[in-house]
């Protein structure tokens, strides 16, 4: 893998973990990041059912990406997302979180990682309404990360924090609408078809 891009950007190359790595979103994180020049997947974590197994065995027939499981991760032993928090935090610079749990459980788990001084970039909706958690589309509102010091004060952390992304449909069209807002656009009709996104997946593998 060519590291020259990351070196040219001030050594932004980072070690990261994926929490919820066996689910569909976790799989997508893997395909996007396994060859990314800025990132190095150091940890894959999932539920106790998958923990302790090589990733290719843990995900098994649930793998639903068009690409094969990347060689870099297929033999990586899956860690326990809820029991290995401190250990995971010590191994990475930050984590991407895509766990499939109840919202209150997700909120608690993400705060545990943050309090272990591990920054969390969350794909989940659990913290989208937490006042001091920034929900960022970098092209639109990068200044929202300025709330992080307040969040750290609440959590009692020096480095750890939580940041979230918006709903997946919004990130597709809002960046295009944003520059049009100055022209006085008042109404927009948007149709999304998220319920169809899993139609090609067989029933046992839907999560």
Language-model-detected regions and their locations in the chain:
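Rossmann-fold NAD(P)-binding glycine/threonine-rich loop
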Residues: 104-157
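Conserved acidic residues
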Residues: 10, 93, 118
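Glycine-rich phosphate-binding loop and adjoining beta1-alpha1-beta2 segment
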Residues: 35, 41-73
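Conserved anion/nucleotide-ligand pocket segment
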Residues: 20, 164-202
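A structured beta-alpha segment of the ubiquitous adenosine-cofactor-binding alpha/beta core
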Residues: 66-107
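N-terminal Rossmann NAD(P)H-binding glycine-rich loop of SDR-like oxidoreductase domains
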Residues: 22, 26-30
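Single conserved hydrophobic/aromatic residue that forms the stacking wall/gate
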Residues: 1-13, 199-207
